[in-house]
Amino acid sequence: MAKQYDMVECPFCDEVSKYEKLAKIGQGTFGEVFKAKHRQTGKKVALKKVLMENEKEGFPITALREIKILQLLKHENVVNLIEICRTKASPYNRCKGSIYLVFDFCEHDLAGLLSNTHVKFTLSEIKKVMQMLLNGLYYIHRNKILHRDMKAANVLITRDGVLKLADFGLARAFSLAKNSQPNRYTNRVVTLWYRPPELLLGERDYGPPIDLWGGGCIMAEMWTRSPIMQGNTEQHQLTLISQLCGSITPEVWPNVDKYELYQKLELPKGQKRKVKDRLKAYVKDPYALDLIDKLLVLDPAQRIDSDDALNHDFFWSDPMPSDLKNMLSTHNQSMFEYLAPPRRRGGHMPQQPANQGRNPAATNQTEFDRVF
């Protein structure tokens, strides 16, 4: 059971009634998110209701951790926490008030934008998206915070074209292992389709490379418009990773055989790395292909970090990164994954390019081949 902290009454918080809810824009295991406006100023905000699973036990430690992290992080490319609000305890809510986190409102999330076929990103605009995303990661990692849930739905974009990393509900502080004692963080983090191979193999002493893998998945998605590896289970996800990034072996990933799961699981053997080959039907820019390839490296120790990624030729070659504001100004409606038609399995799932010369039956990949 998660530790809890008895802070439900939150006596120093304003009442959430100062805001008027306008629309529900998100729903998940974390609770609900609403678009709202300040009744006096008209300022638009997002209200994230803290899910009180075990109300008797007080305020969830996971929410406290998120609040503490958001109060620490102040950066243009990280979502801004304005304040914490509450509802009054009353007989109508079993004498238990609710807690809301109040954020600056962002008009879109990246999953919602990618689900809309009318939204077209130019190469310059994709460069700007990735530059802002990597800037956000560089900042949080420099402040010793791991996001641990990188995915397109957690990347917000304002109407002015400013990207904000959001949903720090799974985030945590990290440190370098001390006195040869490895860290023992949970590996049950990161949405499956964006989860890196080290977590899938059970690693608990991990760091910033887990977020960079998610960044690579998101970067590829800017062209494919759907998550590039849609596994059903952890083993299935590792199979898809092996089919795209090559077989997981000690030759490409030293000491990978230390993982108990590596010994237990039957992972595809003899798979060649084909990140660039599989993506080149969608991604025409060679620098973009190279950066995606460097982000989707199996061995976390060899995966590119945010600093080196920001210095990659992709960002310093023509066309240069360009502002998103003009493109977004042609779209009046907010776009969020929650409000969009499914873009996942089936949806706009990109198909395997026809001229690959591959026989799925012969390679026994029919069941697993959900990459493209």
UniProtKB/Swiss-Prot annotation:
Protein kinase domain: residues covered: 19-315
Gene3D superfamilies per the UniProt record, alphabetical: Phosphorylase Kinase, domain 1, Transferase(Phosphotransferase) domain 1
Residues holding ATP: 25-33, 48
GO cellular component: nucleus; P-TEFb complex
Entry keywords, A to Z: ATP-binding, Kinase, Nucleotide-binding, Nucleus, Serine/threonine-protein kinase, Transcription, Transcription regulation, Transferase
Top-level taxonomy: Eukaryota, Metazoa, Chordata, Craniata, Vertebrata
GO molecular function: ATP binding; cyclin-dependent protein serine/threonine kinase activity; protein serine kinase activity; protein serine/threonine kinase activity; RNA polymerase II CTD heptapeptide repeat kinase activity
A Pfam family recorded for this sequence: Pkinase
Subunit-structure text: Associates with cyclin-T to form P-TEFb. Also associates with cyclin-K.
Active site positions: 149 (proton acceptor)
Biased composition range(s): Polar residues: 352-366
Protein name: Cyclin-dependent kinase 9
Keyword Transferase: yes
Function, in words: Member of the cyclin-dependent kinase pair (CDK9/cyclin-T) complex, also called positive transcription elongation factor b (P-TEFb), which facilitates the transition from abortive to production elongation by phosphorylating the CTD (C-terminal domain) of the large subunit of RNA polymerase II (RNAP II), SUPT5H and RDBP. The CDK9/cyclin-K complex also has a kinase activity toward CTD of RNAP II and can substitute for P-TEFb in vitro.
Catalysed transformations (reactions): L-seryl-[protein] + ATP = O-phospho-L-seryl-[protein] + ADP + H(+); L-threonyl-[protein] + ATP = O-phospho-L-threonyl-[protein] + ADP + H(+); [DNA-directed RNA polymerase] + ATP = phospho-[DNA-directed RNA polymerase] + ADP + H(+)
Region span, Disordered: 341-372
Subcellular location: Nucleus
EC code: 2.7.11.22, 2.7.11.23
Entries under PROSITE patterns matching the protein: PROTEIN_KINASE_ATP (PS00107), PROTEIN_KINASE_DOM (PS50011), PROTEIN_KINASE_ST (PS00108)
Protein family (similarity comment): Belongs to the protein kinase superfamily. CMGC Ser/Thr protein kinase family. CDC2/CDKX subfamily.
Annotated GO biological process: positive regulation of protein localization to chromatin; positive regulation of transcription by RNA polymerase II; positive regulation of transcription elongation by RNA polymerase II; transcription by RNA polymerase II
